[in-house]
Amino acid sequence: MARVKTGPMSRKRHKKILKLARGYRNAHSKLFRTAHQSVMKALSYAYAHRKKKKGDFRKIWITRINAAARMNGISYSVMMNGLKKAGVAVNRKMLADLAVNDLPAFAKLVDVAKAKGNA
C-alpha cells in the first residue's frame, strides 16, 4: 500500500479556516493558528447566542405586554393569570404584536383577563 501524504488536504483545511476568518483583524485573518482559534471561538459564540436569542425575544415581548397592560390598568402577571384562567390560548409573541399594532383588540383581552382575574 502506498504512503499517502497529507499536504494537499492540510492546505485545503487551512484555506477553509482562513476563508472563514476573512474580515478578522491582523494575524487573526492571516496566520492559521490564531485564525483557527478565532474561528472556533466565533462559532461557539454563534451557537450559544442563537440559543440566547430566544430568551432575548421573550424578554422584549414581556416588556411590551407589561407596558400595554399597565396602560390598561393591570399588571403583566395578573393579566397572564387571568388569560390562563379564561382559557385564552394566545402566546406572548402574539400578545406583544397586538400590544404594538392593535391596541383595541389588546384592550379586549385585558378586559377578559380582568373579569377572570377577579373571579
Swiss-Prot record:
GO terms for molecular function: rRNA binding; structural constituent of ribosome. Gene3D superfamilies: 6.10.160.10, Ribosomal protein L20. GO terms for cellular component: ribonucleoprotein complex; ribosome. It comes from the Bacteria. GO terms for biological process: ribosomal large subunit assembly; translation. CDD domains: Ribosomal_L20 (cd07026). SUPFAM superfamilies: Ribosomal protein L20. Keywords: Ribonucleoprotein, Ribosomal protein, RNA-binding, rRNA-binding. Belongs to the bacterial ribosomal protein bL20 family. HAMAP family: Ribosomal_bL20 (MF_00382). NCBIfam families: rplT_bact. Binds directly to 23S ribosomal RNA and is necessary for the in vitro assembly process of the 50S ribosomal subunit. It is not involved in the protein synthesizing functions of that subunit. This is Large ribosomal subunit protein bL20. The gene is rplT.
